[in-house]
Amino acid sequence: MSLHVKGPVCQTCGDIGFEEALVFCDSCMFESIHRYCLGITPIPFTEYITWICEDCDNSESDSDCNEVDQTVKKKKKSRNQPLVVLAEDNVLQEPLEGSKREESSCSRKPHELTCLDGNGESVLEAADSSSVPDHSSCTSKRKEVDQTANLGHILERSEKKKKKKKKKKSINHSPPVLAVEDHELQGTTNVVEPVEVSSSSPTKETMESKRQESSDSRKPHELTCLVGDSETANSSSVPEHNSCAVKKRKLSSGNKQIQLADGSSSCRVAESNMPLTLTSRNYRAQPIKIPIWRGLMSVKGGNSCTMDGIVAHVSSLACPKVHETASSLKGRLSAEILPRLEVWPKTFLKNGGPKDESVALFFFPSSESNDEKVFDSLVDKMKKNDSAMRCVLNDAELLLFTSYMLPKDSWTFNSKYYLWGVFKPRQTSRY
């Protein structure tokens, strides 16, 4: 008998065909198929094609199913294993962990509960129904634990809100002002105890709404909080001083009422950090502690001199426009001495002279300055000659006067006379 060895045959067409086009199974390496019988786009014979026959494909799928069944059985066995619980005498520290323990204890079977007593020996709990807690009692315990967890979260949120409110209050506090060495200014009397005004009081809300209305009514090209005289009041770029007339407001806190002045020429609206410690008669502007300008001042005129180490402090009643203009001052100011009446704003004449709230900047010699005596002598000469100084800036003029021009109780600060200034818009040529 002669044995005929069959060659590879394509599973699709059943013929040998082109043996070069046969592709063998990657799993059994026995079954084959033609490249052109796969039903895919033509591929060169040199490229490798991955193909698995039907028999190998079915066997692999069956093995995968068996593996999945084995993993499922292993998971079920691990769930059915007895759980070990440690006895705890202390109260639950974290409500979330307590809720998890309650759930796990409720899901256990009676014969699977194993505990440790105080001596560390394992004790098997009785399988009686009396020793096993009911599911209803477990659910009630779980609800109690969840309620304690919610209460803990609510308390944490309330504490965070309180901390945020404290931070906001500390930010809204008034800026520090220069401390008075003698603890009193000349001529101060009848100091009233400070009255606290809560942030939620209606009076504060009305004050803030009035500030916003007044600030919105300003034109963008106006230099607000700057002193203007009658000559420049006709131009649209200069606000009238009459619009800064003093208005009284009543602040109620409990059964106490205090009347305060809004401020006249220096600022249209007082800052929200206005201290409420003095009545309207004795309430005065104070220089803010941190100077906004520090530099050299050269004086030209009858008393020519140069003073170094001069500092300027913004008034506590000054508006944001004063801060903006003062912060743009150069390190060297050139001042010209002129007769006071020549540069005296007409608004001061109409309102009976300047008040402490008319001050925009306070000028003092710094503690490091060596020209303190020169500064004091300049103030004395300006008082005797009834003089003033003018510094020409880009968009405004800085007018400087002696403290003698203010009310008597504002003449000195730390027993020293000083200079104070206001900003005045520059006149633009009409032609």
From Swiss-Prot:
Region (Disordered): 125-221
Gene deletion effect: No obvious developmental defects. Plants missing all PHD finger-containing proteins (e.g. PHD1, PAIPP2/PHD2, AIPP2/PHD3, PHD4, PHD5 and PHD6) exhibit an increased expression of flowering genes leading to an early flowering phenotype under long-day conditions as well as growth retardation.
Keywords of the record: Metal-binding, Transcription, Transcription regulation, Zinc, Zinc-finger
ZnF start-end (PHD-type): 7-59
Residue numbers binding Zn(2+) 1: C10, C13, H34, C37
Pfam family, one: SPOC_AIPP2
Composition bias, Basic and acidic residues: 205-221
PROSITE patterns: ZF_PHD_2
InterPro entries: AIPP2-like_SPOC, PHD1-3/5-6, Znf_FYVE_PHD, Znf_PHD, Znf_PHD-finger, Znf_RING/FYVE/PHD
Compositionally biased tracts (Low complexity): 191-202
Keyword DNA repair in record: no
Protein name: PHD finger-containing protein 1
Organism, scientific name: Arabidopsis thaliana
Lineage, uppermost ranks: Eukaryota, Viridiplantae, Streptophyta, Embryophyta, Tracheophyta
Gene from which this protein is expressed: PHD1
